[in-house]
Regions:
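Extracellular/periplasmic carbohydrate-active domains that bind, remodel
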Residues: 2-465
Length: 465
């Protein structure tokens, strides 16, 4: 298995690394939140009777160790050390001021017995399980209402052994929605780093209703055929930084969400201030996706230095009548694509709904989406951008995009309005009007990228942006 040092070498070869001139919520380059990776108290899971043979079920050992460490929460927190070995377990809950540390060659294995993954209530912003009515199985590693939580180590592994769940999905024998590998809920101050995640039953890392989250230097792997094994899904969360990751899964690498139809509208918590940088991956779905569950709104999404290869699409926005909500102020730049079916895809009729209470008049607002500095080889189609009749997607801005496209019809656009500059092959008719100079204010941009614009000509502006 590739280690993160190898991935860093790949990034350097691609020349994608540079500290950005813009930031959203940190002083520079997604600086770490003030979290304590070093704790004054530490215990090993072996001190609580755990056996790392891959056969013994260690759920009680994890639960007892964390219960004991809770006594140090007001004393600087504590670290639970997981040494080399294969540590089979069912679901267990984290606590505040805890570092879960996996040593090199440590593997936390998810139990293949569904009884070891308890059923919990559905998320209020979804109203039911994502796959089935009713509850959902708790994630393997779970936390709720926490502060200052770290999952890290020396590139240890968390393996969900998801094939048993994928088979249930394919055979239609699920009783409840499948579990995620890691879910943190209503939590703030979260760091996940230097871990390899394998074979999630469902979405891999799911911060929901969270603030101040950093996910960096992680590898996420699942077979391309595995259903719905998204990599990282920030959901109704804010101030999220995802950087220096390699992801190869059976669904979206990153999927930004904020609730489902009327439940998400009523809950009303958006995802905002999402930074994604230095990401490499391949998928049977999208590199960076927004939706389709976006009913609480999604805004201030900034992504750069992205390499997507052997994938269905690079950028995708998914929504539908009945979703409501909005997607606005999205800025994606500096992407390299290789062997991608569709570079840019917006879908206005992604019609999955939780129940028959869906209000078809709850129309989403999709506006101010800027995509720039993109190159691609072996791309089948440049764009399939489909809005909603009577609810156009507006202020879609494309700049400095060069794609080697195989299709004779590179673009297909409907119910969309926007602008473009330096796009090859030439953008579709609704996007042909030039950005500069009249429509700069219609496009979303990072302020530092357009300062002193009034004193520049169009060529200089394009070079400096």
């Amino acid at each position: 298995m590739k280690r993160l040092s190898t991935l860093v070498d790949v990034f350097l070869v691609l020349a994608l690394f540079s500290c950005s001139t813009w930031t959203v919520w940190s002083s520079s380059c997604c600086n770490q939140i003030n979290l304590k990776e070093i704790r004054p108290h530490s215990v090993s899971i072996t001190e609580f009777g755990a056996v790392g043979d891959g056969i013994t079920l260690n759920t009680k050992a994890f639960q007892n160790a964390i219960f004991y460490l809770n006594s140090f929460a007001d004393k600087g927190g504590a670290k639970l050390f997981v040494p080399a070995g294969q540590w089979l377990t069912g679901s267990f809950d984290l606590i505040s001021h805890l570092t879960l540390w996996l040593d090199k060659d440590a593997v936390i294995l998810g139990s293949t017995n569904s009884d070891d993954w308890p059923v919990v209530d559905p998320l209020p912003s979804y109203g039911r399980g994502r796959e089935l009515p009713g509850g959902r199985h708790k994630s393997l590693i779970y936390g709720r209402n926490l502060t200052d939580v770290v999952i890290t180590g020396n590139n240890g592994t968390i393996d969900g052994q998801g094939s048993v769940w994928w088979n249930k999905f394919w055979n239609k024998t699920l009783d409840y929605t499948r579990p995620h590998l890691v879910e943190l809920m209503n939590s703030t101050g979260v760091l996940i780093s230097n871990i390899t995640f394998l074979n999630s039953p469902f979405w891999t890392i799911h911060p929901v209703y969270c603030s101040n989250v950093i996910i960096r230097n992680v590898t996420i792997l699942a077979p391309q055929s595995s259903p719905n094994t998204d990599g990282i899904d920030p959901d109704s969360s804010d101030n999220v930084c995802i950087e220096d990751c390699y992801i190869s899964t059976g669904d979206d690498l990153i999927s930004i969400k904020s609730g489902w139809d009327g439940y998400g509208i009523s809950f009303g918590r958006p995802s905002t201030n999402i930074n994604i940088r230095r990401l490499i991956g391949k998928t049977t779905s999208a590199g960076i996706a927004i939706g389709s569950e976006m009913s609480g709104g999604v805004s201030e999404v900034h992504a750069e230095d992205i390499y997507v290869f052997d994938s269905r699409s690079a950028i995708r926005i998914k929504t539908s009548p009945g979703r409501g909500g909005y997607v606005r102020n999205v800025y994606i730049s500096n992407m390299i694509l290789a062997n991608v079916d569709i570079a840019i895809r917006f879908t206005g009729l992604y019609g999955e709904h939780p129940d028959d209470t869906c209000d078809p008049n709850a129309l989403p607002v999709i506006e101010k989406i800027t995509i720039k500095d993109v190159t691609g080889e072996k791309v089948k189609r440049a764009g399939l951008i489909e809005g909603i009749k009577g609810d156009n997607f507006v202020n879609i801005c494309l700049s400095n995009i060069t794609l080697n496209v195989r299709s004779k019809i590179p673009w297909n656009c409907s119910y969309v309005k926007g602008y473009s500059d330096l796009v090859s092959p030439e953008a579709c008719e609704p996007l042909k009007e030039r950005i500069f100079p009249e429509h700069i204010s219609d496009c979303y941009y990072i302020p530092n990228h357009l300062k002193n614009l009034s004193n520049q000509n169009s060529g200089a502006w394009l070079l400096s942006w």
